[in-house]
């Protein structure tokens, strides 16, 4: 089995394609259940955020994974990147550290990777291979953030949106801000807004209790999402980030709100993928809409300023990838020995139990021992005997040579190690 990662992100695919590729809400567990039915896939995990959808899998053939993703969202194949084995390990380490994020070093992605691991494990989609990889990923990401400043003073998409709002409204503290949703992105936006102060903070969410919790923490007013129409016109700035599959803020709603506001400008930030705000809202006069793709350009300055710390983190990741791959290769080299030992132990235990039963039934000890020795010899030597017979028929000299070393003619004899040529350095110019 090979480790594969297939995915798309903000660098390879536009937002409309990313929103079709996203696995929101209950779609993620269902997708994992679907992957588990594929005979070519042994283990799988899905990472789905506003900026990326990635499939991590232990599988024989990546085309099976490509076909599965294309069935989920037709047209993805031309936008997918693909990594295997060591490069797949490197990719996950970089993602979890925030080196592959729109906002370099963002802290939220590590939590999202942990969520992907937890969901995959809860649904039985993880095996020892991916589980070990994710555990190592968490350790590497923590070290990279501790040993470098890649995560210092992190700038998130939410904080970037708040900064743009502050630049657009010189007196944001005299404005009304509406937050739609109550997830992590909206929590971050609320935190940054409360630090800068706003005149009034409205928080609308499908689950009112979640909105109330956030409102209590940041001095806002909680609203059920069903009352969005009534309060949209009050908002000078709107931040929206829900997990809805369809837009929660429509063009019709914004048009009505602008009429009520008597064409007073409204600034809207759509921080969700799939998008929360209908794209055609950007066509309206006095409505200024930013999507996550627009914000990528706004955070490029931050990316440049943190490149030195990122280079240090990359060096840590390079070292950790090499160590991880070395450990995997060592385990692979030990695997035949472990299988051989397990085969010998299980054979011994099975035949010994049978011999003890025969003794307890009164069978003569000499006869039992004779049968035990004969059975052990046959059972243990049958696999190598069959393999050597095939090797002789197929002229497999490598296997027959290995057998000579494993089973020498003289019992107890050990073959000498393979000689290594010695290069003399004391006679650099020998006489002709």
Swiss-Prot record:
Binding site residues for substrate: 49-52, 101, 106-108, 112
GO terms for MF: glutamyl-tRNA reductase activity; NADP binding
Pathway(s) this gene product operates in, as recorded in its UniProt entry: Porphyrin-containing compound metabolism; protoporphyrin-IX biosynthesis; 5-aminolevulinate from L-glutamyl-tRNA(Glu): step 1/2
A single GO BP: protoporphyrinogen IX biosynthetic process from glutamate
Gene3D superfamilies: Glutamyl-tRNA reductase, N-terminal domain (3.30.460.30), NAD(P)-binding Rossmann-like Domain (3.40.50.720)
Catalyses which reaction(s): (S)-4-amino-5-oxopentanoate + tRNA(Glu) + NADP(+) = L-glutamyl-tRNA(Glu) + NADPH + H(+)
InterPro entries, sorted: 4pyrrol_synth_GluRdtase (IPR000343), 4pyrrol_synth_GluRdtase_dimer (IPR015896), 4pyrrol_synth_GluRdtase_N (IPR015895), GluRdtase_CS (IPR018214), GluRdtase_dimer_dom_sf (IPR036453), GluRdtase_N_sf (IPR036343), NAD(P)-bd_dom_sf (IPR036291), Shikm_DH/Glu-tRNA_Rdtase (IPR006151)
EC number: 1.2.1.70
Record key words, sorted: NADP, Oxidoreductase, Porphyrin biosynthesis
Active site residues according to the UniProt entry: 50 (nucleophile)
Chain residue ranges for the region called Disordered: 408-432
Binding site for NADP(+): 181-186
Pfam families: GlutR_dimer, GlutR_N, Shikimate_DH
EC class of the enzyme, as a word: oxidoreductase
Residues under site feature: Important for activity: 91
Cited HAMAP family: Glu_tRNA_reductase
This protein's domain notes: Possesses an unusual extended V-shaped dimeric structure with each monomer consisting of three distinct domains arranged along a curved 'spinal' alpha-helix. The N-terminal catalytic domain specifically recognizes the glutamate moiety of the substrate. The second domain is the NADPH-binding domain, and the third C-terminal domain is responsible for dimerization.
Miscellaneous comment: During catalysis, the active site Cys acts as a nucleophile attacking the alpha-carbonyl group of tRNA-bound glutamate with the formation of a thioester intermediate between enzyme and glutamate, and the concomitant release of tRNA(Glu). The thioester intermediate is finally reduced by direct hydride transfer from NADPH, to form the product GSA.
Protein family: Belongs to the glutamyl-tRNA reductase family.
UniProt function note: Catalyzes the NADPH-dependent reduction of glutamyl-tRNA(Glu) to glutamate 1-semialdehyde (GSA).
Subunit structure: Homodimer.
Name of the protein this chain belongs to: Glutamyl-tRNA reductase
Gene: hemA
């Amino acid at each position: 089995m090979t480790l594969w990662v297939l995915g798309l992100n903000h660098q390879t695919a536009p937002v409309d394609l990313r929103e079709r590729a996203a696995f929101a809400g209950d779609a993620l567990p269902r997708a994992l259940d679907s992957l588990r039915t594929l005979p070519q896939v042994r283990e799988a995990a899905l990472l789905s955020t506003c900026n990326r959808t990635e499939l991590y899998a232990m599988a024989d053939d990546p085309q099976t994974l490509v076909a599965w993703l294309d069935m989920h969202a037709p047209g993805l194949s031309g936008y997918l990147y693909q990594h295997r084995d060591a490069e797949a390990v490197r990719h996950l380490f970089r993602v979890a550290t925030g080196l592959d994020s729109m906002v370099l070093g963002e802290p939220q992605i590590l939590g999202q990777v942990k969520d992907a691991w937890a969901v995959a494990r809860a649904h039985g989609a993880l095996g020892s291979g991916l589980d070990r990889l994710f555990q190592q990923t968490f350790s590497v990401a923590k070290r990279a953030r501790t040993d470098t400043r890649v995560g210092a003073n992190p700038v998130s998409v939410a904080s970037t949106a708040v900064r743009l709002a502050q630049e657009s409204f010189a007196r944001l503290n005299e404005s009304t801000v509406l937050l739609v949703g109550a997830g992590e992105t909206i929590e971050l936006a609320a935190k940054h807004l409360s630090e800068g102060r706003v005149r009034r903070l409205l928080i609308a969410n499908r689950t009112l209790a979640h909105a109330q919790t956030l409102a209590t923490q940041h001095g806002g007013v909680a609203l059920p999402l069903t009352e969005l129409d009534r309060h949209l016109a009050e908002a000078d700035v709107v931040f929206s980030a829900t997990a809805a599959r369809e837009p929660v803020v429509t063009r019709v709603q914004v048009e009505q709100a602008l009429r009520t506001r008597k064409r007073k400008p409204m600034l809207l930030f759509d921080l969700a993928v799939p998008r929360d705000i209908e794209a055609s809202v950007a066509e309206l006069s006095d409505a200024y809409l930013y999507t996550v793709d627009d914000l990528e350009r706004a955070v490029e300055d931050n990316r440049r300023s943190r490149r030195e710390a990122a280079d240090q983190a990359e060096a840590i990741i390079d070292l950790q990838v090499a160590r991880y791959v070395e450990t995997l290769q060592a385990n692979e080299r030990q695997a035949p020995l472990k299988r051989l030992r397990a085969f010998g132990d299980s054979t011994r235990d099975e035949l010994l139990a049978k011999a003890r039963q025969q003794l307890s039934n009164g069978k003569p000890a000499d006869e039992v021992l004779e049968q035990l020795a004969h059975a052990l010899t046959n059972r243990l030597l049958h696999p190598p005997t069959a393999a050597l017979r095939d090797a002789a028929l197929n002229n497999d000299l490598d296997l027959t040579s290995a057998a000579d070393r494993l089973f020498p003619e003289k019992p107890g004899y050990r073959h000498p190690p393979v000689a290594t040529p010695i290069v003399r350095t004391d006679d650099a110019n020998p006489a002709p």
